Amino acid sequence: MVMALVLIKLGTGEYLSLAKSAKEEIAKIKGVAKVYAVFGRYDLVAQVEAPTLEELSRIITDKIRAIAGVVTTESLIVGF
């Protein structure tokens, strides 16, 4: 099992509604264990788990980055 913390930056605009809807959509993705709204450089942090590194990459690039409002992501792969 591979796990990563994905730091997510959202676009500007109706921030509160955008953050809430993006958080809800990300939480529905298979492999996403938890999603937190945070303050600071990033807006959301998602804990993502997958059986392989390739599957983890697919979830992040094909699913999370496709959510409306997501501008950038940075992934921190957990080593142990």
Task: Kindly give the residue locations of the regions a language model identified.
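A compositional/biophysical signature of low hydrophobicity enriched in polar/charged and small residues
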Residues: 1-80
